[in-house]
């Protein structure tokens, strides 16, 4: 049994990484990148487990391990709210596996110095691995602090960096890492996985709408909807209302994390694409989100082709602003106003 068995899809990556490890030729620094929900952390844990020679953390993206740590913190006297709101600076598994995750919303340079000064700044006779999750939240200070260690790593130390946006990673970091692209899972494999996990109902529909994203497919299979997609559809509906559109949309998006907002922006682009297809009479099978055709048909006449075409640049610019750590609320406000301006002449 391979540690990679817990990772859906990614067969070419698994084969390549396994061969490199067997040949002792794997670079000491890897950069895994792919959209949120593709379970890149599971791949990072599988690679780390293969390097160390045992299961590190837990194969379910570390969820079981993290739950165990949270329970231990509560039992030791920390309040449940503190434990839920703030993770540990570094998670350590038996002294040879280290995991840094964003605390609240961002990675901090203090987390790196903690692990560097206390744990890894020495050579070892046995393999050790550091997983850095959520690197899209890292600022330049942290990236530069990591760069020196990546350039001159301690002996037997491997670094696995995980990001949902490679475009925000410093070129100096990218150039020193082996790049590993995490891709959507094929529909047959994802259907098979959800069936084996015990999901019922219209799994094929869930997988089709999720477009190869395991996290979104499970969400649809459990609830019958994808929350970020529903919110995107609601935005398009509210933008063509004559009054209260700004307040209604703002309240519906209040308090959402950066990653969720990015998902909503992506769904807006897909919905706009399908609405353009509707306007030009494209057949049903050409639509990506055909299950939403009735909702789209109800408003498509109130969105001109020009306004729908504006959705793509507006949301891409907003996504880039979020990557650069512009306040989420300001980005949301900008999107609402820009898209309202695009449709205003049609209302």
Question: Which residues are covered by each model-predicted region?
Answer:
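An amphipathic, basic-hydrophobic helix/alpha-beta surface used to engage anionic
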Residues: 132
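A short hydrophobic beta-strand->loop->alpha-helix junction that borders the nucleotide-binding pocket
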Residues: 33-35, 99-104
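Extended basic-aromatic, gly/pro-enriched interface segments that bind polyanionic ligands
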Residues: 92
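Residues immediately C-terminal
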Residues: 99, 106, 137, 152, ...
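Loop/turn-to-beta-strand initiation segments
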Residues: 124-129, 154-160
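Conserved alpha-helical scaffold flanking the Walker A/P-loop in AAA+ ATPase domains
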Residues: 15-21, 85-88, 106-129, 137, ...
């Amino acid at each position: 049994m391979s540690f990679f068995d817990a990772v859906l899809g990614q067969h070419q990556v698994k084969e390549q990484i396994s061969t490199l490890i067997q040949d002792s030729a794997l670079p000491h620094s890897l950069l895994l990148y792919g959209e949120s929900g593709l379970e890149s952390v599971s791949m990072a844990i599988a690679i780390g487990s293969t390097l160390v020679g045992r299961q590190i953390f837990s194969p379910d993206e570390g969820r079981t391990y993290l739950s165990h740590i949270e329970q231990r913190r509560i039992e030791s006297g920390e309040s449940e709210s503190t434990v839920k709101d703030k993770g540990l600076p570094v998670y350590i598994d038996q002294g040879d596996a280290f995991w840094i995750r964003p605390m609240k919303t961002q990675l901090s340079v203090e987390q790196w110095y903690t692990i560097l000064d206390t744990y890894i700044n020495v050579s070892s006779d046995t393999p050790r691995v550091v997983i850095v999750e959520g690197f899209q939240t890292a600022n330049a200070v942290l990236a530069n602090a990591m760069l020196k260690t990546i350039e001159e790593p301690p002996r037997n130390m491997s670094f696995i960096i995980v990001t949902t946006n490679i475009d925000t990673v410093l070129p100096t970091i990218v150039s020193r890492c082996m790049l590993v692209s995490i891709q959507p899972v094929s529909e047959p494999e994802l259907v098979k996985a959800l069936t084996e996990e015990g999901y019922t109902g219209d799994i094929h529909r869930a997988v089709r709408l999720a477009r190869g994203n395991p996290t979104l497919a499970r969400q649809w299979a459990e609830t019958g909807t994808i929350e970020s997609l529903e919110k995107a559809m609601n935005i398009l509906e509210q933008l063509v209302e004559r009054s209260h559109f700004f307040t209604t949309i703002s309240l519906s998006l209040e308090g959402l994390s950066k990653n969720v907002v990015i998902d909503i922006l992506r769904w807006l682009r897909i919905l706009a694409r399908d609405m353009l297809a509707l306007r030009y009479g494209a057949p049903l099978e050409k639509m990506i989100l055909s299950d939403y055709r009735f909702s789209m048909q109800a408003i498509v006449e109130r969105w001109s082709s020009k306004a729908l075409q504006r959705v793509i640049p507006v949301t891409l610019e907003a996504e880039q602003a979020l990557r650069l750590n512009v306040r989420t609320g300001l980005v949301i406000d900008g999107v609402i106003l820009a898209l309202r301006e695009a449709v205003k002449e049609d209302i």
